[in-house]
Curated annotation (Swiss-Prot):
Binding site for GTP: D49, V50, V51, D68, K70, E120
GO MF: GTP binding; kinase activity
Pathway: Cofactor biosynthesis; coenzyme A biosynthesis
Pfam families the record matches: DUF359
Disulfide pattern: none
Entry similarity comment: Belongs to the GTP-dependent DPCK family.
Organism: Pyrobaculum neutrophilum (strain DSM 2338 / JCM 9278 / NBRC 100436 / V24Sta)
Protein name: GTP-dependent dephospho-CoA kinase
Keywords per UniProt: Coenzyme A biosynthesis, GTP-binding, Kinase, Nucleotide-binding, Transferase
The protein's role, per its UniProt record: Catalyzes the GTP-dependent phosphorylation of the 3'-hydroxyl group of dephosphocoenzyme A to form coenzyme A (CoA).
Enzyme class (EC, first level): transferase
Amino acid sequence: MRCLRIRERRDLFAFPYPIAVWREPPRSLEVVSDLALSYGVEHIYTVGDVVTKNFLDYGVTPTSAAVDEKTRRGLPVEQHRKFQRVIKVVNPPGYITEEAWAAVEEAVGGGVLIKVEGEEDMLALAFIKMAPPRSLVVYGHYKGALIAVMVDWYRDAIDRLLQYLEKC
């Protein structure tokens, strides 16, 4: 993949797409777990420190995850022990670098924690684009919701959204 960055229409990327769960943990994770069970989800990918920590605390180890080791809540997050491999990448805010694309491509196979120097938020798009069928990508919305994206339902919409990103 190539490097992409947000140049305009940031509003399109801030909207809480697909399923927004406006509940605190552990209820939010129960809702997402029920959704995954109901639809036969085989892989769950998490993006974000708090989301990943909450899944692990609830006893659900994601297939793979991306974190930047920074949280708005200032919570310490240690999740590297649950993953077979750690990949470190540089990914500035608003970007998906080639290095980050490559890490996500490897991570969709499972067992990978991507540690991002910069910001991991945009990697949710890369996971949605590359995850296998029957996958769920979960991330936190800045206003407090847990967002769950059924990859099979939204991959085409994300492909269209990626067209708004500028090559870098």
